[in-house]
């Protein structure tokens, strides 16, 4: 697969990128190089190869998924002018 100059200009216009003729020519070479590399990757036989997310198998450390109150109630209300237990007290605004 390769890209021509008209396609480069069209994509630049769709992306709302202003490119000069010289920049478009430069991008044409770069995009064709990238597409050539992708074509090489598609030629690699990967039958029987398991998908992986890391070069070495790594088991992620996970914390227990336990619901807690965060144990921060005292810290949260510490600077409030008025509190009742772990709740903020505010002046009545609706009659």
UniProtKB/Swiss-Prot annotation:
Keywords: ATP-binding, Ligase, Nucleotide-binding, Protein biosynthesis. GO terms for biological process: glutaminyl-tRNAGln biosynthesis via transamidation; regulation of translational fidelity; translation. It catalyses: L-glutamyl-tRNA(Gln) + L-glutamine + ATP + H2O = L-glutaminyl-tRNA(Gln) + L-glutamate + ADP + phosphate + H(+); L-aspartyl-tRNA(Asn) + L-glutamine + ATP + H2O = L-asparaginyl-tRNA(Asn) + L-glutamate + ADP + phosphate + 2 H(+). It is an enzyme of class 6 (ligase). The keyword DNA damage does not apply. Allows the formation of correctly charged Asn-tRNA(Asn) or Gln-tRNA(Gln) through the transamidation of misacylated Asp-tRNA(Asn) or Glu-tRNA(Gln) in organisms which lack either or both of asparaginyl-tRNA or glutaminyl-tRNA synthetases. The reaction takes place in the presence of glutamine and ATP through an activated phospho-Asp-tRNA(Asn) or phospho-Glu-tRNA(Gln). Heterotrimer of A, B and C subunits. The gene is gatC. Belongs to the GatC family. Its EC number is 6.3.5.-. The keyword ATP-binding applies. NCBIfam families: gatC. This is Aspartyl/glutamyl-tRNA(Asn/Gln) amidotransferase subunit C. One of its GO terms (molecular function) is ATP binding.
């Amino acid at each position: 697969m390769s890209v021509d100059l008209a396609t480069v200009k069209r994509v630049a216009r769709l992306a709302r990128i202003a490119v000069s003729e010289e920049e478009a020519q430069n991008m044409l070479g770069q995009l064709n190089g990238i597409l050539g590399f992708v074509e090489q990757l598609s030629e690699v036989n990967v039958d029987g190869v398991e998908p992986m997310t890391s070069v070495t198998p790594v088991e992620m450390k996970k914390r227990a998924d336990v619901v807690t109150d965060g144990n921060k109630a005292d810290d949260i209300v510490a600077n409030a002018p008025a509190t009742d237990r772990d709740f903020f007290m505010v002046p009545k605004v609706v009659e």
